[in-house]
């Protein structure tokens, strides 16, 4: 069977919570499906940190004369990450061809087994990494993550344009850090001046996630509180 569908989680702007969205969405899918995460963010891999497996390393085996990685299994998710390859305290200074080759090898040398969905945590930007994913990893869909800041929205529109040119279907957009909740009154407080994101970006908003300290780290006990609706929206589109 192999991997049935690949979903890239992407944002042109860094710092909008793409990795956190990827982790939580994959966890929701893992309740009903076989799921993996490929952390392809070579400049700032975070999945091994979010899933609290920083001290772990994928087992390396030789299969058919080739080196293979056995992914880490955590919270019913199979994970392989550039974070297992790179030093946490050192910057990756790789040029485009090296970056592209590393992402391709990480996916191909990992023994994923039979997966319903493989989520790819993309690097921010619209450069070589995007082209590699499109041409080599061939995602079935991409899901964009943004905040409502003017700069993030502008860059999300650029990212949308690139994926359209690459002919990769875009599921929609997740509006992250959209609002806060007052601890005193429970009142929902928008973090930005309200804008019509669907009109600005031209894509369906599949969920609005709050800015809350509970989501700065992955917590499976509260994940469903924030992501179950988004999970159902995404699943309805891709199934």
Mark where each language-model region is.
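Residue-level signature of catalytic and energy-coupling elements of molecular machines
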Residues: 3, 14, 47, 80, ...
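Walker A/P-loop phosphate-binding motif and the immediately C-terminal alpha-helix
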Residues: 5-39
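Short glycine/serine/threonine-rich phosphate/pyrophosphate-binding segments
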Residues: 18-23, 45-46, 122-130, 152-155
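Conserved nucleotide-binding/hydrolysis micro-motifs of P-loop NTPases
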Residues: 42-43, 85-87, 124-125, 148-152, ...
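Phosphate-binding/switch loop-helix module in NTP-utilizing enzymes
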Residues: 83-133
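Conserved Switch II/interswitch segment of TRAFAC-class P-loop GTPases
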Residues: 113-120, 126, 138-159
